[in-house]
């Protein structure tokens, strides 16, 4: 006979066995994760007990209601993952990394509660639609994470009740702000080679159905070692270097093909214009069909209490947009309806002059011409160009080596080769050196679908001067 998967022999007291099985299951919790498979936590291990208690707080459960990829679900049908699943994943990767690092640096084990709690809570301050509204409304989710950790919250009470490590909340805030010593502990959670990026590249790639973010996670983790003298983490060996190079190219591809996908840009711009209209109407004392106080204060840039901020999530924001479909203002009503029904704006890349750099004066002139022509066309369709036309720019570096002049220079990826050479990655790798020096800035025209057929004509018109100059040159040659 089997009870809970355990064979019971004749004569054994079943009641006692059932009690033992129950105690085992009560102590352990398993999260079935599509990326990391079984994430098992055990209450008998202090750091894992802390994690379990933090997961059960209302502040952390809120992350279930915030999309990891903002509005990317409009572009990729599977992009429905939450900040909750990502945060649990980051904690799990951090735990794996500690296991690897402690083989040569046993002292890191005493920091396990701090590292795991920091990894778990690093994103607890995200607002509705994650980074999308953060960029639109100019707030800092990391600052909100610190306020939630240090405020009058369930998270703070769990941290204060963890007697194995006093002042844990203050230590986590310092670690997230990169003010904690030793500094390499912060690098585990936030750096150019951190557990946050490892998880989101794997997870976002999986959820969007793309292969760009695949990386050799275990090989990278095995190659990482602590250099206590330099207070940093280094990647050791040729195999580790190769895996890190692949990781950086994967990050580049994820930004180019997923995060900055043209439909994602259009969806973000659409939401930005919708919220811009809301803010304009608020200034005009418009009487909305619906608007709760925390949302009004948030959109207006007013100071929020932690409780007010915690009431904001994707569900609440989407409910507002649903209600605004019934609003009396025709522009807000139209933008809200288009957003809900995925009749979103479109986007097209504005091509720079032949051989011209994005930042030169000629290209700026082209962008301005394209925007002005589009505004005139939109106006002819009876739409307000202020809310139906935009220029979006994208630019990023998959790896940013240390620059002394930078205000907040990111940590280098340091390689220790098999021959003992220690160097910054881009100095050792020509391919990464080229990646660092590349120009990845692009400009995109955002416009309503009604004028889709006219957009190419607008681009040709903007480049007409260049075309005429080329033809004139060719004529002289002939």
Name what the model sees in each region.
Residues 114, 119-120:
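Elongated alpha-helical scaffolds
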Residues 121, 125-126:
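Short active-site segment of divalent metal-dependent hydrolases/proteases
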Residues 2-9, 14-114, 128-478:
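Histidine-centered, transition-metal-coordinating active-site segments
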């Amino acid at each position: 006979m089997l009870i809970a998967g355990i064979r019971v022999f004749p004569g054994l007291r079943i009641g006692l066995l059932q009690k033992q099985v129950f105690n085992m299951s009560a102590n352990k919790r398993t999260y079935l994760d599509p990326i990391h498979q079984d994430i098992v936590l055990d209450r008998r291990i202090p750091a894992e007990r802390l994690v379990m208690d933090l997961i059960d707080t209302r502040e952390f459960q809120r992350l279930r209601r915030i999309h990891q990829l903002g509005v990317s679900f409009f572009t990729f049908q599977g992009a429905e993952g939450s900040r909750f699943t990502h945060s649990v994943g980051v904690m799990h990767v951090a735990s794996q990394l500690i296991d690897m690092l402690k083989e040569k640096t046993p002292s890191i084990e005493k920091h396990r509660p701090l590292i795991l709690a920091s990894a778990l809570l690093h994103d607890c301050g995200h607002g509705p639609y994650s980074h999308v509204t953060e960029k639109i409304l100019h707030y800092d989710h990391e600052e909100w994470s610190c306020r939630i950790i240090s405020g009058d919250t369930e998270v703070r009470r769990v941290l204060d009740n963890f007697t194995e490590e006093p002042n844990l909340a203050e230590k986590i805030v310092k670690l997230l702000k990169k003010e904690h010593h030793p500094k390499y502990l912060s690098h585990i959670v936030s750096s150019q080679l951190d557990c946050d990026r490892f998880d989101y590249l794997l997870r976002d790639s999986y959820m969007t159905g793309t292969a760009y973010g695949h990386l050799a996670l275990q090989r990278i983790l095995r190659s990482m070692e602590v250099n206590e003298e330099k207070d940093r983490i280094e990647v050791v060996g040729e195999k580790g270097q190769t895996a890190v190079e692949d990781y950086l190219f994967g990050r580049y591809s994820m930004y180019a093909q997923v995060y900055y996908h043209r439909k994602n840009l259009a969806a973000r711009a659409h939401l930005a214009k919708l919220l811009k209209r809301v803010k304009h109407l608020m200034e005009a004392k418009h009487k909305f069909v619906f608007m709760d106080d925390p949302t009004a204060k948030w959109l207006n840039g007013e100071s929020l209490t932690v409780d007010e901020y915690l009431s904001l999530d994707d569900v609440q924001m989407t409910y507002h947009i649903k209600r605004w479909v019934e609003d009396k203002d025709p522009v807000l009503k139209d933008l809200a309806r288009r957003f809900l029904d995925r009749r979103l704006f479109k986007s097209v890349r504005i091509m720079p002059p032949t051989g011209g750099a994005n930042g030169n004066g000629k290209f700026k002139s082209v962008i301005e011409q394209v925007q002005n022509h589009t505004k005139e066309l939109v106006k002819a369709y009876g739409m307000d160009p202020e809310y139906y036309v935009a220029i979006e720019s994208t630019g990023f570096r998959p790896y940013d080596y240390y620059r002394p002049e930078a205000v907040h220079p990111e940590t280098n990826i340091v390689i220790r080769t098999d021959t003992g050479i220690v160097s910054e990655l881009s100095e050792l790798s020509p391919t990464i050196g080229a990646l660092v020096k590349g120009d990845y800035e692009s400009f995109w025209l955002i416009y309503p679908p009604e004028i889709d057929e006219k957009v190419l004509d607008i681009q040709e018109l903007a480049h007409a001067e260049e075309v005429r100059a080329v033809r004139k040159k060719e004529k002289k040659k002939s």
